[in-house]
Amino acid sequence: MRESSQIRETTETKIKLSLQLDDGKNVSVRTGVGFFDHMLTLFARHGRFGLQVEAEGDVFVDAHHTVEDVGIVLGNCLKEALHSKEGINRYGSAYVPMDESLGFVAIDISGRSYIVFQGELTNPKLGDFDTELTEEFFRAVAHAANITLHARILYGSNTHHKIEALFKAFGRALREAVERNANITGVNSTKGML
């Protein structure tokens, strides 16, 4: 089974995270940041991934370190769980509506980290979550996993709905990208490696 478990401990955070690419039955998220827990749960459910996250961070300052470090560990686990990348689609994309909002995510498991994030988040805070941390999370995942990730909010008026559409689209796009494809021999690249 393609899976990984890692721990990251710094003076700011302690993150314990497990990711299962082929078994989406067990999802449990506790980061101390309620809205972020909700988004990670949506990502896992809509991507059909198993995800267990336990995080302790300096949320008395703000949620930045917790959100970013969870992104780093998730990216590291994704990279380790995929290891050879043989037989996977490599590419994935998804449009996801959430009421009046529409989110889009495209992924290339390329071995090259790059991110493009576009979208206006008009409400600066949702509960204890600074909405600008949405981009920081995706940036951390992309860099740690060495993937190319494009995330775009096409339109919408409710900030919660916009971010929710992105996290669901991220799950669905990543599911497509990591899916095994019987028609692909080796890695899906003319270079012979990713």
UniProtKB/Swiss-Prot annotation:
Annotated localization: Cytoplasm
Superkingdom of the source species: Bacteria
GO molecular function, one term: imidazoleglycerol-phosphate dehydratase activity
Reactions listed under catalytic activity: D-erythro-1-(imidazol-4-yl)glycerol 3-phosphate = 3-(imidazol-4-yl)-2-oxopropyl phosphate + H2O
Any single biological process term in GO: L-histidine biosynthetic process
Database matches in Pfam families: IGPD (PF00475)
CC per GO annotation: cytoplasm
Pathway(s) served: Amino-acid biosynthesis; L-histidine biosynthesis; L-histidine from 5-phospho-alpha-D-ribose 1-diphosphate: step 6/9
Main location: cytoplasm
Record-linked InterPro entries: IGPD_sf (IPR038494), ImidazoleglycerolP_deHydtase (IPR000807), ImidazoleglycerP_deHydtase_CS (IPR020565), Ribosomal_Su5_D2-typ_SF (IPR020568)
Keywords, alphabetical: Amino-acid biosynthesis, Cytoplasm, Histidine biosynthesis, Lyase
PANTHER family tied to this protein: IMIDAZOLEGLYCEROL-PHOSPHATE DEHYDRATASE (PTHR23133:SF2), IMIDAZOLEGLYCEROL-PHOSPHATE DEHYDRATASE HIS7 (PTHR23133)
UniProt xrefs under HAMAP family: HisB
Listed name of the protein: Imidazoleglycerol-phosphate dehydratase
Organism: Bacillus cereus (strain AH187)
Gene designation per UniProt: hisB
